[in-house]
Structure formats: structure tokens, C-alpha cells
Amino acid sequence: MKTNEWISDVPVYEPGKPIEEVARELGFADVSEIIKVASNENELGPSPKALKAMAAAAPEMHRYPDGGCFYLKDKLSAKLGVKPQNLLFGNGSNELIEFLGHVYLGSGTNLVMSECAFVVYRLVAALFNAQVIAAPMKKFAHDLDAMLAAVTPETRMVIICNPNNPTGTIVSSAKIKSFLKKLPAHVLAVFDEAYFEFMPDDKKPDLIKEIQKGRENVIVLRTFSKAYGLAGLRIGYAVGHEKLIALLNRVRQPFNVNAMALAAAL
């Protein structure tokens, strides 16, 4: 059978072992003695309100979820000060990164990222047979000038994880504003803000304002996995220009966000 040849070169993500298995191998009787640091999970767990909402939703699990995330979209758009059309939800922000790959990446294209950043960016680029250009960092922080210098006519996206995973460094609002002024209009700036809620308020860049102003080549990705402790439910969201969100919605499968995740996030 004929297949897409490059798929054989896509690396397979290898998840860590379950804590229970690690405990068994190391001879620990109590799994609470082991702390799993690889996935940056919130050890406080979900909010009691989220647990209550999930319990209330459980009897309706025979129903398909709200495919348009209507109520969550309505509530979150009001909180962020954007229109519902500026929002898209995914099965974790990982799925949203894959949506971006569907829309922007392919053979002969590339994405620019820092040399030490979230592994999924490389996996998604490989999935669509796109090149990764890894820009050098300064003291484990994004060097936005180096990232700009790496942009070519074939570049479709520049991905900035802020705060960065795994180095934990933050790019200032001033540097981001300067970066956006210089970024070519044909390139999408993707800001992965999975750890946004952990930043001090005076360090948080307000990229939502760029979207409110109508800027088309900026998208912000956030998640309920980290600060809200809902990693096991897989729910994240994108904020972007409504034209961009409409394109991403075309590659989204129906019912991609499960009903339990919707209940907990709401």
C-alpha cells in the first residue's frame, strides 16, 4: 500500500510510566511518596466546584457533548472581552497546535521555534512534513531577534511558549511588542500561554488586546490543564481573529471536546 512516506520519520511520543508501575519497580508501598515532575501536573487537583459540576454531569454521559461549546464559549468570551467567534476549544491545547498544522504547514514550509521548547511543536511539524527552524536562546530564554532572523519566505508560523516550557523563562511585554512590529505579515505568531496564570500580573503580556484590535496574524493558546488542574480531561482554547478561528474550525472534528471537560471548565 502507498502511504505518506514522511510518516515513517515522525517520532513517536513516549509517555512516562504510570506512577503505580514506578512504585512497584522501585519497591515503594505508597505511591504518594513519588512525585511525577515530567508532566507539570497540578498536585492540588481540580477545584471542588469542578468536581461538583462533573458529578452533576455524569448521569448525562449517554448524550453527545455540545459540539460548539456554546455555554463555555459564551462565558469565556465575556471574561476575556472578545467575541464568541474569537474562540475555539480543543482536546487540550495540543490539538489546537495540530489544527494550526492542518491550516498552515505542509511540504516546503517551515515553522520557527526556540531550540528548547515544547516537544509537540516538532511533532506537529513532522506530521505535516514541514521543516523546523530552531533559533538559539539566551540564558534559556527566547531570543526574539534570533527568531525574527530565522524567518524565511517559507515560514508560516513562529511559536513562542511564554512562560517557556521547559525552561520557565518569561519574555517581557516590551520585547513582544517590538517583535510583533517587525514580524512579516505573512507569518502567524503563535503564543502558547499554557502557564499564563502562573506569571506575576505585572509580567503578563496582554496579547488579547492585539486580537481585540483586529490583528490577524496573532493567536493565543491557553489550557485548563495546569492552573485549573484539569489535565486528565484535556481541554484548551485558542483566541484569535475570527477569520483565523473560522479556518481552524474547518479542520476540527465534531464533538472534539468531551462533555465532562465542558462541565468542569464551565
Where are the regions a protein language model picked out?
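Short beta-strands and strand-loop turn motifs
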Residues: K36-A38, A134-A135, M157-P163, A189-E193
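PLP-dependent aminotransferase class I/II
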Residues: G68, N217-L266
